[in-house]
UniProtKB/Swiss-Prot annotation:
Gene giving rise to this polypeptide: ndhC
One Gene Ontology cellular component: NADH dehydrogenase complex
Entry GO MF terms: NADH dehydrogenase (ubiquinone) activity; quinone binding
Source organism of the structure: Nicotiana sylvestris
Assembly and oligomerization: NDH is composed of at least 16 different subunits, 5 of which are encoded in the nucleus.
Membrane topology: Multi-pass membrane protein
This protein's name: NAD(P)H-quinone oxidoreductase subunit 3, chloroplastic
Length: 120
């Protein structure tokens, strides 16, 4: 029998986590003073006048490093629970984790050989 009352805490948390940001935006929009002027339109750069154009295009190298970082950060998120319950899970899960890491290493070697990790 499927009992929906077991999920009451989940639904309450979901509704609260949706309502809190919405209410924060609405309240700040109502209470914030409306002031427009040249100070609001100027670029802020550490309290001093900006030197040159404030809008600079990032190099694609930063994007590639960020992408590789995110991939290996997600790998850590997946492997940490596995490492904490390694003795309970057995050999089959070890093989699955090994294949997962192997695929990521192959991707890293591919990115390295393509020159995605070099600054030149």
């Amino acid at each position: 029998m499927f009992l929906l009352y077991e999920y009451d805490f989940f639904w309450a948390f979901l509704i609260i986590s949706i309502l809190v940001p919405i209410l924060a935006f609405l309240i700040s929009g109502v209470l914030a003073p409306i002031s427009k002027g040249p100070e609001k339109l100027s670029t802020y750069e550490s309290g001093i006048e900006p030197m040159g154009d404030a809008w600079l295009q990032f190099r694609i190298r930063y994007y590639m490093f960020a992408l590789v970082f995110v991939v290996f950060d997600v790998e850590t998120v997946f492997l940490y629970p596995w490492a904490m319950s390694f003795d309970v899970l057995g050999v089959s899960v070890f093989i699955e984790a090994f294949i997962f890491v192997l695929i990521l290493i192959i991707g890293l070697v591919y990115a390295w050989r393509k020159g995605a990790l070099e600054w030149s």
